[in-house]
Amino acid sequence: SSAEIWIYKPAPEKATGQAIVFCPGGGYSQLSIANGHNTCKWFAENGIVGVMLKYRLPNGHSEVPLNDLDKAVATVREMAGELGVDPHKVGVAGTSAGGYLAGSAGVMSESKPDFMVLIYPVVSSDPDKRHLGTFQQLVGKENVETEAAKFSLEKVVDSTACPALIFHSDDDKVVPAINAALLYEKLKANGVKASLHIFPSGGHGWGMSKKFKYHENFKAATLDWLKVINAEADKAAAKK
């Protein structure tokens, strides 16, 4: 199988110049495709080019999903003209294991995205904090104890990471909220711009569900932060 992308374009009069490549969750064993499409449609409704990425699952080959995401980001930058996108305004986003993938690009990729939005992301491989299934799929069950630490995002963050917006729910029983807090703490220790929202409830996997109590808060906080990032990109471009 190969990776695929679907592109949702905003109405030209609404376009912000930003694009976001979205990585659906699924514990690296499957993909919540529907939530990915819904999220990308919502981005487009708000002036952002939404790019839904159906990435290949790792099956123990840890480089596979990240290669797909890196290629998708590069493709969007190459197509910037026809998409009405500024190539310096291409971000990534994802939920759960997809949040881990987006975070991996923002922290580890050589050619990083310009920003990342991580929604209840898997971050840490520490035994008391991790979502075990994600790391088993990433490095192979037999390699988790020896290999997973080098893929623990909070352990590999440095000052080259891109700005981050992170969401989690305090009562998440699948991926503990401490994952989000650990990454935020390490981003700040490295001088990286980051914003963290931990909602009181909601559990895991709320995505774009209107049943999520903080759905409107989540949407507003995301758009507010993207506006800030957009203004900063414009300011940086004006200085050049």
Question: What do these predicted ranges mean?
Answer:
Residues S1-K14:
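N-terminal cap/lid segment of alpha/beta-hydrolase-fold proteins
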Residues T16-G25:
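Short beta-strand element of the alpha/beta-hydrolase
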Residues P24-S29, D170:
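Active-site glycine-rich loops that stabilize anionic/oxyanionic intermediates
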Residues L31-I33, N38, M52-P87, S209-N217:
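Catalytic nucleophile-loop/oxyanion-hole region of alpha/beta-hydrolase
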Residues K71-T134, A148-A149, L153:
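Primarily recognizes the serine-hydrolase "nucleophile elbow" in alpha/beta-hydrolase
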Residues T160, I166-H168, D172:
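Short beta-strand/loop motif that positions the catalytic acidic residue
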Residues K173-L182:
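Conserved alpha/beta-hydrolase "acid-adjacent" motif
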Residues A181-K240:
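C-terminal catalytic histidine-bearing segment of alpha/beta-hydrolase fold enzymes
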